[in-house]
Amino acid sequence: VDWKKIGQHILSVL
C-alpha cells in the first residue's frame, strides 16, 4: 500500500 500517495490524495480531497 502506497501510504504516501494515499496521504496526498487525502490532502487533495480536503
Curated annotation (Swiss-Prot):
Expressed by the venom gland. It comes from the Eukaryota. One of its GO terms (cellular component) is extracellular region. One of its GO terms (molecular function) is toxin activity. Keywords: Amidation, G-protein coupled receptor impairing toxin, Mast cell degranulation, Secreted, Toxin. It is found in: Secreted. The modification Leucine amide is found at L14. Belongs to the MCD family. Mastoparan subfamily. Mast cell degranulating peptide. Its mast cell degranulation activity may be related to the activation of G-protein coupled receptors in mast cells as well as interaction with other proteins located in cell endosomal membranes in the mast cells. This is Mastoparan-J. It comes from Polistes jokahamae.
